[in-house]
Amino acid sequence: MKILLLGSNGQVGWELKRSLAPLGAVTALTRHSEKGLSGDLADPDALAATVQSVRPDIIVNAAAYTAVDRTESEPERAKLINAQAPARLAQEAKSAGAWLIHYSTDYVFDGSGSTPWQETDPPSPINVYGRTKLEGEEAIGQSGCQHLIFRTSWVYASQGRNFLRTMLKLAAEKESLRVVDDQIGAPTGAELIADVTAHAIRAIEREPGLSGTYHLTAAGETSWWAYARLIIDTAAKAGMDLKVSARDVVPVPSKEFPTPAPRPGNSRLDATKLKDVFGLSLPAWEDGVVRAVQEITQPGGDRAFFRNHLL
């Protein structure tokens, strides 16, 4: 099996390089050209040429424009990367008879209510990021290519830029922390996303009728405030030198942190379909968060990195 992986230097892409390696020959690309191949989603023509050159059986697109607030001032670039490039990849996948695996977001929904969103619920994004990601989903679906679209939320890893690492940095620097407590979702590790992806690829080899959209998150739900408390408590128990304890994290409403792009209050995603179709049991969100913090704080991890406040 030949796999073309785009966005291989991102949080999810980094883990995919590990999880996909046993499945076949992986061509892992970043947005920079390498050996005449391009993984730059801002250049759909170069992407198409790369697909035609590699001739993969599976295309895994882990690249996206994910700077949510910046997309409000750069909507055309967001549309190019999040919508037009996936559309072109889908066309090439259809022509080549390849599968396209693509990652999307809870931001395709408006965040209303308190019930977990199902795949059949009508999308209604409230910001540019969500709208462009939805356009990418729709283009893939309309292309007729065999595909898996995984919607996920609150992605983190022990490396890269994410909420988990930001909280550790701030807890080492600040005397107090204020974190929003009225946005609810499930922190989902890049490691889990990559492992589920590899499992799904094995499944579609046997059952090509599994093409479609699936929600992929860790089990359970929490607020950003409670999430931050677990991060800090776990790091403190591991011996990390912090100025803030978990009990010092103050819950505040979202209105106290206005952002260019509005955030959904309800980011819950119902992963029942994924579990039933692929025969999976998804771990509790706390398990992955504790593991990621322990990876950072263990000897040889990023403890010194955070001590120097370099994020």
Language model segments and positions:
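N-terminal Rossmann NAD(P)H-binding glycine-rich loop of SDR-like oxidoreductase domains
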Residues: 1-22
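SDR active-site strand-loop-helix element
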Residues: 6, 29, 62-63, 100-105, ...
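Rossmann-fold cofactor-recognition segment
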Residues: 30-45
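NAD(P)H-binding glycine-rich loop region in Rossmannoid oxidoreductase-like domains
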Residues: 41-81
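Catalytic helix-loop patch of NAD(P)-dependent Rossmann-fold dehydrogenases
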Residues: 73, 80, 85-88, 95, ...
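NAD(P)-dependent short-chain dehydrogenase/reductase
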Residues: 141-199
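Mid/C-terminal beta-alpha module of Rossmann-like enzyme folds, strongest
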Residues: 196-197, 203-258, 304, 308
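Amphipathic terminal alpha-helices
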Residues: 285-311
